[in-house]
Curated annotation (Swiss-Prot):
Belongs to the RNA methyltransferase TrmD family. Keywords: Cytoplasm, Methyltransferase, S-adenosyl-L-methionine, Transferase, tRNA processing. GO terms for molecular function: tRNA (guanine(37)-N1)-methyltransferase activity. Its EC number is 2.1.1.228. This is tRNA (guanine-N(1)-)-methyltransferase. It catalyses: guanosine(37) in tRNA + S-adenosyl-L-methionine = N(1)-methylguanosine(37) in tRNA + S-adenosyl-L-homocysteine + H(+). Pfam families: tRNA_m1G_MT. GO terms for cellular component: cytosol.
Amino acid sequence: MRIDVLTLFPRMFEGPMGESIIGKAREKQLLELNVSNFRDFSDNKHQTVDDYPYGGGAGMLLKVQPIYDNLKAIEEETNQQPKRVILLDPAGKPFNQKMAEEFSQEEHLVFICGHYEGYDERIRTMVTDEVSLGDYVLTGGELGAMVMIDATVRLLPDVLGNNLSAQTDSHSTGLLEHPQYTRPAIFNDMEVPAVLTNGNHKLIAEWQLKESLRRTFLRRPDMLESVEMTPEMLKLLEEIKQEEQK
């Protein structure tokens, strides 16, 4: 996968995008990450990238020309127009796991990181997606882009040591992940549930499903509305409701 990031602060990406899973993906050549400063594409000697809004208003807006020329340079380099150009915007659609899965199917993504008060509206005509990290405002789009890149890249084949890890993560199944334990079996009188140490894989799978349902029911009941429930899951959910009422 190739990812291009358009930003005014490329150095912000040097550390986070060179470590851990993303760093390893780049080392394995599973990910090509290019970060460009769209100030370099400004057409005036002062390299201005923002200006006052027509009609008045608070703050400065990002100009259309530098971002347009930066996108055109990417198109010329790759000999094709990127299929997904993502604008980081507080007014955009909230980012979620399903969106990360969609992005992971693409060969090329472009992220545009905003700054200042906002964008010249004409920039929006150049993008395919307007995405927000959540219902709050950050100084710029850089941190949001890093989060989305991380969530997307870890879904690529062979990026994680165990591909099953991405499939069983919280949100990937529509449910929050069940509790997990490692050695020792007893620590400060806190014991690992016996079912996990008895070697009965059928009982373990049932416990994991039930506890995944329980955690989702208690912490994010809204997620259950979009889960396609099997008869077994419905039965377990009723048991959970009765247990939690005691």
